[in-house]
């Protein structure tokens, strides 16, 4: 027990959005260097809290491998974070990309809690990840850590989970749980891990999704947060808003934020005397050999798989900008149509641009190349929708494009929402007003059609597809089906010129 007026220092170390970057060397992961720094701090002071704000399980080639290729193996990021003795992690929406079974299995092997107060069981409304907060004791000093996830980021993330999981408004859940923590636990210091961003950053970027960057609102309306750890915007920042400190620790373990908090003992409580913060450039530290040894075979397996050749036919499927895909059937989009038909034998197929800045494929194609062309785990769905649904989806994307002198000049849409259809002919007249540009041939707007599209399309256009009938979801991902097509020695790409865009 400390005497009155004595001081105590607590070191808080935080990482963010590490995206399973555990491959070292040319891949540049700094988690092994972070291990060295954390060990140095622990050697100087045993009062250390190591936190991650979420986003550690998905978002890289290595993450894809451990979900799609080797799902039976323990996730290397969990092994690393266990060995580094993380105290808690927030929960990112990206953690749900590969489904609940993967996420639940990964978290079950973690020796630290995953915290999110507003991700709940759909039926009972209890927190999905057990208790959404934890308490760290240093003598009679009590530090509470609670996690919340930006509800705006959770929208459209994974359709499979909706029958099991619901998302409460971040602000509502935060108020309820923080009030509970203060009344029941009476902590000396409260940390909120918020997997969402700062509005002041989002105002200068294209990412302005509602309810995604509410850190300032939480700090202002709750008023009892001592430290807020934010995430998702992939920037490194340290600041103060009224009485609350806030930090964000970049991405991919490139940097680490270190806060040294000095507490002074009062009669029955502790006061914060000072908070010193610094951003740690991890490139200045050597990699921790124990951590490297821990993932040696994991890294070797991913490296071997990534270089496996899928096709050496010398296919030319390069994409030189969005215009290549939205103005005519491109060999790359034809490959997507051919692949998705392996799942369900429907005449009508809908595919979308796999990623912003899509480059396509060319030459010798390895697993790594295919991942970079189609990095997301989209899965085909068999459904019945109306002709009007088809028109509405096409109208949406072409209403957000503009052409000048036959060149695409303006894109005010996430490129992955641009869809390409086959199974009927259609024409886009960019000279018409938005919402009146699409003409469908052989499609009756009042009739229903059996269609194959990805779960990504379904989630993001669900407001148009409220009356859709879902028949079946396919187990394998689009990239797996694409690889199957590319490996077929008899496969030849033959483009179906079924749509035209008038942009003069």
What do the predicted segments below correspond to?
Residues 162, 324, 378:
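Conserved short-loop catalytic and cofactor-binding motifs
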Residues 6-7, 263-365, 486-504:
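A short C-terminal boundary segment appended to hydrolase-like catalytic domains
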Residues 2-284, 327, 331-339, 472-477:
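Acidic, metal/ion-coordinating pockets
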Residues 136, 288, 438:
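Short aromatic-centered micro-motifs
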Residues 71, 202-212, 294-297, 304-305, ...:
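Charged, glycine/proline-rich intrinsically disordered loops and linkers
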Residues 14-21, 313-322, 464:
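Acidic/histidine-rich, surface-exposed loop or edge segments in extracytoplasmic proteins
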Residues 9-11, 21, 27-35, 110-118, ...:
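Feature captures C-terminal
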């Amino acid at each position: 027990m400390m005497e009155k007026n004595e001081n105590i220092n607590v070191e808080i170390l935080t990482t963010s959005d590490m995206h399973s970057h555990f491959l070292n060397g040319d891949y540049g992961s700094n988690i092994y260097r972070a291990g060295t720094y954390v060990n140095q701090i622990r050697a100087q002071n045993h009062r250390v809290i190591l936190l991650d704000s979420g986003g550690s399980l998905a978002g890289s080639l290595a993450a894809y491998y451990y979900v799609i290729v080797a799902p039976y193996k323990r996730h290397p990021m969990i092994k690393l974070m266990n060995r580094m003795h993380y105290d808690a992690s927030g929960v990112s929406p990206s953690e749900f990309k590969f489904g609940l079974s993967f996420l639940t299995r990964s978290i079950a092997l973690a020796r630290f809690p995953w915290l999110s107060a507003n991700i709940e069981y759909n039926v009972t409304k209890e927190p999905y990840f057990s208790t959404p907060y934890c308490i760290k004791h240093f003598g009679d000093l009590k530090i509470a850590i609670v996690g919340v996830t930006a509800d705006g980021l959770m929208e459209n993330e994974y359709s499979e989970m909706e029958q099991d999981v619901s998302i409460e408004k971040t602000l509502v859940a935060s108020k309820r749980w923080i009030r509970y923590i203060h009344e029941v636990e009476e902590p000396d210091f409260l940390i909120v891990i918020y997997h969402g961003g700062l509005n002041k950053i989002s105002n200068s970027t294209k990412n302005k999704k509602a309810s995604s960057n509410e850190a300032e609102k939480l700090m202002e309306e709750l008023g009892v947060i001592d430290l807020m750890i934010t995430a998702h915007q992939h920037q490194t920042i340290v600041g103060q808003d009224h009485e609350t400190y806030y930090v964000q620790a970049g991405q991919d373990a490139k940097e680490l934020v270190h806060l040294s908090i000095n507490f002074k003992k009062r009669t029955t409580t502790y006061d914060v005397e000072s908070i010193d913060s610094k951003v740690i450039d991890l490139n200045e530290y050597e990699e921790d050999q124990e951590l490297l040894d821990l993932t040696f075979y994991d890294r070797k397996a991913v490296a071997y798989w990534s270089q496996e050749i899928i096709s050496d036919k010398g296919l030319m499927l390069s994409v030189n900008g969005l215009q290549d895909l939205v103005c005519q059937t491109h060999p790359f989009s034809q490959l997507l149509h051919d692949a998705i038909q392996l799942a369900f034998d429907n005449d009508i197929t809908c595919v979308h641009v796999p990623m912003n800045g899509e480059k396509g494929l060319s030459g010798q194609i390895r697993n790594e190349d295919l991942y970079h062309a189609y990095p997301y785990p989209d899965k085909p769905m068999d459904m019945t929708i109306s002709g009007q649904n088809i028109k509405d989806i096409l109208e949406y994307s072409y209403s957000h494009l503009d052409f000048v002198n036959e060149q695409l000049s303006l894109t005010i849409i996430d490129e992955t929402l641009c869809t390409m259809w086959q199974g009927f002919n259609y024409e886009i007249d960019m000279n018409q007003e938005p919402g009146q540009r699409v003409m469908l041939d052989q499609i009756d707007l009042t009739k229903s059609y059996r269609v194959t599209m990805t779960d990504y399309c379904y989630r993001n256009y669900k407001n148009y597809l409220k009356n859709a009938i879902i028949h079946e979801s396919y187990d394998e991902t689009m990239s797996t089906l694409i690889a199957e097509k590319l490996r077929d020695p008899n496969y030849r790409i033959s483009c179906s010129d079924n749509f035209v865009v008038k942009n003069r």
